[in-house]
UniProtKB/Swiss-Prot annotation:
GO MF terms held by the record: 3-hydroxyanthranilate 3,4-dioxygenase activity; ferrous iron binding
UniProt entry keywords in alphabetical sequence: Dioxygenase, Iron, Metal-binding, Oxidoreductase, Pyridine nucleotide biosynthesis
Function in brief: Catalyzes the oxidative ring opening of 3-hydroxyanthranilate to 2-amino-3-carboxymuconate semialdehyde, which spontaneously cyclizes to quinolinate.
Residues noted as binding Fe cation 1 in the record, renumbered to the chain: 51, 57, 95
Positions annotated to bind substrate: 57, 99, 110
UniProt organism field: Paraburkholderia phytofirmans (strain DSM 17436 / LMG 22146 / PsJN)
Subunit architecture: Homodimer.
Binding site for Fe cation 2: 125, 128, 162, 165
Upper lineage: Bacteria, Pseudomonadati, Pseudomonadota, Betaproteobacteria, Burkholderiales
Full protein name: 3-hydroxyanthranilate 3,4-dioxygenase
InterPro entries: 3hydroanth_dOase, RmlC-like_jellyroll, RmlC_Cupin_sf
Length: 174
C-alpha cells in the first residue's frame, strides 16, 4: 500500500474542508508526516506579520485573488496573486500573505524544515518601518505552532512597542 493513500479528487477535498478554510482556522494541511507541508489556505485572512521562511514557498492561487506584502531592503512591496497564478518565493524573503476575498483558496507548498532550521515571524513598525519584534520557531505544524506565537505578540504591548520610535504596533489586523 502507498504511504500517503490513493489519489483523490482535490477539488472535492477543498469543498469537504471549506468550513476550515475560513476564520478562525483559515487553513488545513493535506497530508501529515510528509517531506512537504502541503497546506490549503482560505480567505478572508489579513495578517500583520512577515514570515521569514528559510526555504522556498510555492503558491498556487486556485480561487479568487490574494497578494503578498514583501519586505525588501526596508521597503514594502506587493506581489498580486490572481486566480490561476503560481509563484515561487525565494528563501528568506519576508512576506505577509493577504487574502481579502471570502472564498478565496490558495495551495501553499513548503518543505519540512531540517532539525535546527528555524522560521522567523516579524512585525514592523507602521510609523517608522523598523523591526518591532521577531520570534523564531522550529516549525512542525503551521496549523498548531503559529497561533500561540501570534497571540503572545498580540497580548503584549511591550512586544508591540517599537524600540526606535515608541509607536505601538496595533497587533492583530481587524
Amino acid at each position: 500500500m502507498l504511504t500517503y493513500g490513493k489519489p483523490f479528487n482535490f477539488q472535492r477535498w477543498i469543498d469537504d474542508h471549506a468550513h476550515l478554510l475560513k476564520p478562525p482556522v483559515g487553513n488545513q494541511q493535506v497530508w501529515q508526516d510528509s517531506d512537504f507541508i502541503v497546506t490549503v489556505v482560505g480567505g478572508p485572512n489579513h495578517r500583520t506579520d512577515y514570515h521569514d521562511d528559510p526555504l522556498e514557498e510555492f503558491f498556487y492561487q486556485l480561487r479568487g485573488n490574494a497578494y503578498l506584502h514583501l519586505w525588501i531592503d526596508g521597503k514594502r512591496e506587493r506581489v498580486d496573486l490572481k486566480e490561476g497564478d503560481v509563484f515561487l518565493l525565494p528563501p528568506h524573503v519576508r512576506h505577509s500573505p493577504q487574502r481579502p476575498e471570502a472564498g478565496s483558496v490558495c495551495l501553499v507548498i513548503e518543505r519540512q524544515r531540517p532539525a535546527g532550521v528555524v522560521d522567523g515571524f516579524e512585525w514592523y513598525c507602521d510609523a517608522c518601518g523598523h523591526l518591532v519584534y521577531r520570534v523564531e520557531v522550529q516549525l512542525k505544524s503551521i496549523v498548531s505552532d503559529l497561533p500561540p506565537l501570534f497571540n503572545a505578540f498580540y497580548a503584549s504591548e511591550e512586544k508591540r512597542r517599537c524600540g526606535h520610535c515608541g509607536h505601538v504596533h496595533p497587533g492583530k489586523a481587524v
